[in-house]
Amino acid sequence: MEQTFVAIKPDGVQRGLCGEVMKFIQPMKHYLDLKDMPFYAGLCKYMSSGPVFAMVWEGEGIVKMMLGETNPADSKPGSIRGDFCINIGRNIIHGSDTVENAKMEVGLWFKPEEFVAYAEKAKAWVYE
């Protein structure tokens, strides 16, 4: 079972889309790997401009499918970005791109004691 870090960005929170996204079931440190990119300062300013709704999702290979492509224009309908986004710079949600990055990003935002062990009985009927 894979885990990934997911954050609804300030534009998604301000637009009141947290509930809609949920139906799909330290910004500077988080984006440190992008520090040499020309858009880094603007990205940090944007990610600090308002509240961020952070969470960890778990599933088997479904996270990218649910989020959609980074560019909303390339995202399929039925994905979060395909349904709710119109601009690559304001694509409302961040999702870890690899399992390794997910572990690092989850560690930046959450402490181990903040997780609750929850054994969902339906998983045995859904996943082999």
Curated annotation (Swiss-Prot):
Q: Which cofactor does it need?
A: Mg(2+)
Q: What is its EC number?
A: 2.7.4.6
Disulfide bridge map: none
Residues bearing N-acetylmethionine?
M1
Q: What class of enzyme is it?
A: transferase
PANTHER family reported for this sequence: NUCLEOSIDE DIPHOSPHATE KINASE (PTHR11349)
Q: What is this protein called?
A: Nucleoside diphosphate kinase B
**Species, as recorded:** Merluccius hubbsi
Identify the gene encoding this protein: nme2
